[in-house]
A protein has these predicted regions:
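Extended beta-sheet lipid-handling architectures
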Residues: 62-66, 77-79, 89, 96, ...
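Non-transmembrane domains of secretory- and envelope-associated proteins
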Residues: 23-37, 174-176, 211-321
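N-terminal leader/targeting segments and the immediate start of mature chains
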Residues: 22-78, 85, 139-145, 162, ...
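Flexible, processing/modification-adjacent segments and terminal tails
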Residues: 46, 120-194
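An acidic-aromatic
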Residues: 24-26, 90-150, 284-285
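Bacterial N-terminal signal peptides
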Residues: 9-20
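Bacterial N-terminal signal peptides that target proteins for export
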Residues: 1-11
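Short helix-loop boundary/capping segments
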Residues: 186-218
Length: 321
């Protein structure tokens, strides 16, 4: 019998990977100085904002052995301890342990071609996998509402392409934050991503992703930011994430990290980014067909609406616990 529902574990795994973030190896004992201001105007231009956010391009590799993961939507699951290794653009590996399972844990990763999640089910391990391009083409029917590679960028290493910004440009919100909406084309239609940015130091604090039918499919809240002058980036040490699958309840997770190592992998394993050869395995693209049939009885989704206007009154979304 499975100890945890596999779909929930899969989504929990991708959330855990997504919120890895990055920074130099550092202890949390001393309170770091606040990020320095970089804007000398109330509302910077799109180009200035993009330059500030895209400072994360300086991070090519990162590792941590001090992550703690709390699956908020699955209170029966204890906190996980995890190690994570990431190399631009799509290579990552995360191993997380469940104390109550006596060493049996989660193994998930990605390379340029595919991503995978190996999870414990009963006395054996089960591998779920997919090719990036095939999975991205079926996001409207997939078990996970976002591609894991998008999650890594959105939560840990955000980027802003000035050419994708909607006609509203940079909006100064009444709560003091800056807001930017980008249009993200995909085989499943055009998604909309909303960023909330700290107005002085120019780092992302909130991200919202809307499907072509304007459903909210993912959001994140990053906090405990620190500035690292050696790489000139501002990085969060705590992130909360929530996903909204097409069927099933929302999935929420929080991750806290004490220390990071940037631009160096804390592993000498030559197979670090190679998918395991687990015998029991399932293709997530094929499983998406089953998910599609499960949601086939829902009311028809109306055609995609035009890009909505910005509003400085926009809600930040329901707070996670």
């Amino acid at each position: 019998m499975s100890l945890i529902h596999p779909t929930s574990v899969i989504i929990a795994c991708v959330l855990a990977i997504a919120i890895g973030g990055c920074a130099r190896t550092i202890s949390q004992v001393d309170v770091p100085p606040p990020p320095p201001p970089i804007f000398d105007v109330a509302t910077p231009s799109i180009e200035e904002l993009a330059a500030a956010i895209n400072r994360t391009d300086a991070v090519r590799e990162l590792s941590t052995n001090s992550a703690r993961v709390d699956v908020l939507s699955m209170p029966a699951v204890p906190k996980l301890t995890a190690s994570m290794h990431l190399r631009r653009q799509k290579s990552f590996r995360l191993r997380a342990s469940l104390p109550i399972m006596m060493g049996t844990g989660l193994d998930l990763g990605s390379n340029d071609n595919e991503f995978w999640f190996e999870v414990p089910e009963g006395m054996s391990q089960t591998l779920y996998y997919a090719h990036h391009d095939q999975y991205s083409a079926q996001l409207d029917r997939a078990i996970l509402p976002v591609d894991p590679s998008w999650m890594i960028q959105a939560i840990g290493l955000p980027r802003l392409d000035a050419n994708k910004v909607s006609r509203d440009g940079v909006v100064a919100r009444r709560d003091g934050m800056l807001e930017v909406r980008t249009l993200e084309p995909s085989p499943a239609g055009t998604y909309q991503r909303v960023m909330l940015i700290e107005p002085s130091a120019g780092y992302v604090t909130h991200l919202f992703l809307y499907a072509p039918d304007m459903r909210l499919v993912a959001k994140s809240i990053a906090s405990k930011h620190q500035y690292y002058d050696t790489v000139d980036v501002v990085l969060p040490h705590e992130v909360k994430v929530e996903l909204f699958p097409a069927s099933g309840p929302p999935l929420a997770m929080q991750m806290e990290i004490d220390r990071y190592t940037v631009n160096q992998l804390l592993s000498g394993d030559p197979q670090l980014f190679v998918m395991p050869t687990t015998a029991r395995r399932f293709d997530l693209v094929q499983l998406a067909g089953g998910a599609s049939s499960m949601i086939g009885n829902r009311a028809a989704v109306p055609p995609s609406r035009p890009v909505s206007q910005y509003s400085a009154k926009a809600e930040l979304g329901t707070k996670l616990r």
